[in-house]
Every structure is written in C-alpha cells, then in structure tokens.
Amino acid sequence: MKIAIGADTDGFELKEHLKNYLKSKGIEVIDKTPEKGINLVKSASLVAQAVMNKEADRAVAIDEYGAGSFMVGAKHKGIICAEVSDEHSAKMTSQHNSANMLAIGAGIVGKRLAEGMLDAYIAEKYAGGRHQIRVDMLNKML
C-alpha cells in the first residue's frame, strides 16, 4: 500500500511524525509536502491528486483542525474524504464509506491517537454490500 501524506504549516510536525511511523511499519509513504510553509488548500489538493492519479492508494491530509483539508479533499472527483478524530471513525469510514483520504486536525489529536487512527484506517477493508449504494452515490456527485 502507498499512502500520500501532506500538511499545511499547522500540521507539519504531526505529518513528519506520522510519515516516520508509517515507514517504520513498512508502508510506502509519498510525502507531498516535504517543505514547511505550504498552505492548506495546496497541501490537501496535492495528496488528493496523488490518489486521483493512482500515485497512491490512500491519502492523509493534516491541518490544524482537519475541517479545511476535508473541504478541499471533498472537492476532488473520485475522492471520498473523511475528517476523523478517533480510531473508531477512522475504521468505520474505511469499512463503510471506502474513504480514500483522511483529514486530521493536529490541534485536535495527539501523536499516539493519530497513530491509532492510521492503524485502524489502513487495517480495515471496505465491506461493500449495502454500503456500495452510498459509495456509488458519492462518486456520481462530482
């Protein structure tokens, strides 16, 4: 699995931590914002585009509260973005919504919780079935 990760200035420290965490677990990470100072819209767009272009399987965008990255991610065709701040939501959005992008707020979650959220998101597989109707509806919106 390849994960694209990026952050604005407020999320940069958490992004660096999570990038190293994922690499330590053997996951290939594509850092779309290697330099600090990229704004929220640009950073979230870069990770969304990595999934759209099939450079990455999933994406993680980090800003101060997660809401901005969520709004940007949701504007991209083929992206199902979920703003999460707990492990259960990260698991369920993968299982029920086939989310291919997470938006995380560095001002909301700490490093350990963010690690747990990524673990839950990555480990969970999309269930399909009755949830496919919703996913199809989401994919037709843009």
UniProtKB/Swiss-Prot annotation:
This protein's record includes keyword Isomerase: yes
InterPro entries: LacA, RpiB_LacA_LacB, RpiB_LacA_LacB_sf
Pathway(s) it belongs to: Carbohydrate metabolism; D-galactose 6-phosphate degradation; D-tagatose 6-phosphate from D-galactose 6-phosphate: step 1/1
Molecular function per GO: galactose-6-phosphate isomerase activity; ribose-5-phosphate isomerase activity
Keywords, in A-Z order: Isomerase, Lactose metabolism
Pfam families listed in its UniProt record: LacAB_rpiB
Catalytic activity: aldehydo-D-galactose 6-phosphate = keto-D-tagatose 6-phosphate
Enzyme class, spelled out: isomerase
Similarity-based family: Belongs to the LacAB/RpiB family.
Description of how the protein assembles with itself and partners: Heteromultimeric protein consisting of LacA and LacB.
Protein name per its UniProtKB record: Galactose-6-phosphate isomerase subunit LacA
Gene from which this protein is expressed: lacA
